[in-house]
Amino acid sequence: MHVLPALLLPPTLPGLRKRLLAAAVASIVASTPAGSAWAACSEAPQAAQLFVRGTMNNWGVADAYKLAWQCDAYYLNVDLNGKYEFKIGDAAWSEQTTFGTFHQQFAGAQTIKVTFAHGKPQIAVGPRSYVDPDTAVPTDPVALSLAHDSRSLADKAPFGAVKAGSEVTLNLAALPGITKATLVIARRTLEGNQEVLSYAPVARVAMQRQPGKNRWSATYRYADIGVYGYHFEVEIKGRKYLYQNNRQPLYWTREQGVNGTGTAQAVVKGQTIRPFRQTVYAPDFQVPAWASDAVYYYIFPERFRNGDRANDPKPGVTRYHDQGIELHANWLDKPYRPRSGDGSDNLDNNDFFGGDLQGVIDKLDYIRDLGANTIYMTPVFQAASNHKYDTADFRNIDPHFGSNADFTRLTVEAKKRGIRVIADASFNHSGSDSVYFDRYANYRAQGAFRGEHVDPASPYADWYVFDTKQTDPNRQYKGWGGTVDLPELNKNSPSYRQFAYGAPDSITRLWLQRGASGWRMDVAPWVPDDFWREWRKVVKAERSDALTVAETWFDSSKFLLGDTFDSTMNYIFRNAVLDYASGVKAGTAYASIEMMREAYPPQAFYALMNLLSTHDQARSLHVLGDHGNDPAAAALARQRLRLAMFFQMIFPGSPAVYYGDEVGVNGGDDPLNRATYPWADLGGKPDLALLADVKALIAMRAAHPVLRHGSIDAPLLLDDHVVVLARRDGGTWAITATNNAATATTVTVTLPAGAPAGPYVNPLDGSTATAQDGRLTLHIPALFGAVVIGGAK
């Protein structure tokens, strides 16, 4: 993503705030306990399911914040502390069912009550009063004894994601007293940005009690690829109970539950079932072998390096839609923040520094010396903005970045240094200022909306969907995320599909032929699944070792089934690791990582783009506490960043370093997260000590294949501060440990069966350790980690 500062529509999206504020007037009032004095019950006033969406959940749609209608009001129990901003809205941010902008100071366990009068919501927040049927805890001792751990081979075999055609055996343990047990299988439908989420029944399998044991067992064969859910139903003394997924949230993901152990609950009317999730992928799913060895250098080209001043945008000449542009005279300026009083104009994304492809070419040796072997650049095609996701011409490099020949030259020079280049594009939308749309009549081509007039004769007419009944040009078409600068493309248009991937000279093929080693595809959830299935076939036919990476922020299981993408931008990893480095309990943060280990096919799990900073989120140092005005906080944030990057380098997947993170570049939300790299020859002050540490961590990963390819199981130790993992690659073992406490610690762990006694060597400092009676002692620095490697060389 590129325009929104969060995954889903925030209140600051241009135009949206004004419309929503006009849609409703709401107030915060004292709470009335649920059920204290019922009026006549009525139907819910809104047909759509409503959610609380705000800063407490990244403005996302999450079942943990789903409002429940009961008689005369909507209710939600929350456990929050501090001030939050939120709206009431449906899963799709529909204009008709998005209400208010509320600011509320929460104080622990409370109930939110929402009533409607004349179509306008009134919010009441007070002491916990609503009895949620989904949270009722059973009192029957047999029901309370129900136990299943989806990550234990004793309860589910085989582990994790399975190939289509596989049989999976599931076990449920309990005290005596169950008269009947059933395994319930359902198949998930997930569409768009999680707006559509449902499960359709597939099978009910009678479970058999294992002779002589208080365990019930059933086996089910998954014939087709997909994401499935399962839960258990049991009867005890004539009453039905469920055993289902837990309530722990998964970052960015609508569904509650991270698998592992679940919870028991009595069956009641209207409850929401939380299935354990099961991924079933294509037996022939292959990911390019090089992906697990990749270390990305992630570049926002306009802000990396100006290698050719002759192609810089020129104020008074270069146009931005029907306006002008701004060019910074000083490379070290901060990006402009429109409407902030910094002296800039009021236009978003029209300030430039002059970064270009020649600048990337000039710094290939720097990237190689850092240890990166894969460059991912945000789009470089012709576009009006500085971010280039508003594509004007998919076939040509933006003239302010260089030429098509420069792109090929970049890939050739990169290859000489052992570096691949991944291209980026959005096939979901174009720019309004483009050859295809041409809202501002800046092109000679016959655009579909040239000069704000729909042209049915345009060769691009069916690439967009128009509503000619509207008189306001902004309402005659749909802009992605409500942004009129980004008209959504009609992905069902045969002509557009031919252009995007179907034709011999399609965009997909063209840039692979020009040297790209793969594609990162923007806002992948907004594009239909069948589009991606056809697209993947073209990519692999054109270049079998090309990598396909989706931009998804939530649980990406549906995109990693072998029929669409190889990998994804791992925002779940980002949030988990930055939370952990910030001091969140290790067990809480690591649960989301364990969910991915279980849910994702192994070939995809080892190729995930494990990032920390991005062009869409605040930089890591900002998240970790450096807000620019406290030297002590800045130093602490840098050490926390070292911990986060240590975790990146010892974990499966492909670490991604966002340009400048390695030298301490900081910045909050867009546009401050897109600051320039502080090159010393331009007067910048890169943090060379941090750079040396990052180089050492990347070199450690490169020198030890066990850190890239080694197997990984559940942690050997997981407490409030420490995570200890064992990795194995053939006869080589790595034991890794991280510590988010402010003090150093010493832990002793029992090694897995087959692990050698030692000696184990720490590749960072040369220290050694040897196990005694199968137990290994590790000394872990404060806010950092330790790794020791032993066994066969």
State where each predicted segment sits.
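Aromatic-rich carbohydrate-binding modules that target alpha-glucans
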Residues: 41-83, 91-106, 173-225, 235-256
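Active-site clefts of carbohydrate-active enzymes
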Residues: 604-634
